[in-house]
Amino acid sequence: MTGSVDRPDQNRGERLMKSPGLDLVRRTLDEARAAARARGQDAGRGRVASVASGRVAGRRRSWSGPGPDIRDPQPLGKAARELAKKRGWSVRVAEGMVLGQWSAVVGHQIAEHARPTALNDGVLSVIAESTAWATQLRIMQAQLLAKIAAAVGNDVVRSLKITGPAAPSWRKGPRHIAGRGPRDTYG
């Protein structure tokens, strides 16, 4: 036991390096690299000679300078508008703005007494809190359309459908049987 002792880990590594399968892999890799170099492509270096950074030697980083630049951080709202514009969502965003920011679009006083319910095919449905406000909004319809167009753009809302509050129901309970028809109940 005084001679040299072979470690099993060391023998395994040496056997692996001499195996015919590994030689085949190395040869195939060398052939692929040579073919890539012949085509003028980057042959790759594997793990051995990896570059510490992605910079090309001899090129310095250029700073954007004191003026605005495309690489400067952009406000989130601007980036969202550009994304909506690129993807063709501008009309949908404008429609959502009419419904979501109604008070800012038409003004505080009108927003207190009327609320939008739907926007379908350029027709904005608005429910007023009273018949008097519904009549007033119908009279002001041209001015309302101008305010909306100024806030969100033309052709988003082409017309308004203004309704008053729903009429009272005389039904009692969850079930209903058809009555005898309309009657003069106030007379």
Curated annotation (Swiss-Prot):
Membrane-spanning ranges: none
Location of the region described as Disordered in the Swiss-Prot/TrEMBL record: 1-23, 35-75, 168-187
Biased composition (Basic and acidic residues): 1-17, 35-45
Pfam family membership, one: DciA
Coiled-coil zones: none
Top-level taxon of the source organism: Bacteria
InterPro entries recorded: DciA-like, UPF0232_actinobac
Family according to the record: Belongs to the UPF0232 family.
Protein name, as recorded: UPF0232 protein Mb0004
Naturally occurring in which organism (per UniProt): Mycobacterium bovis (strain ATCC BAA-935 / AF2122/97)
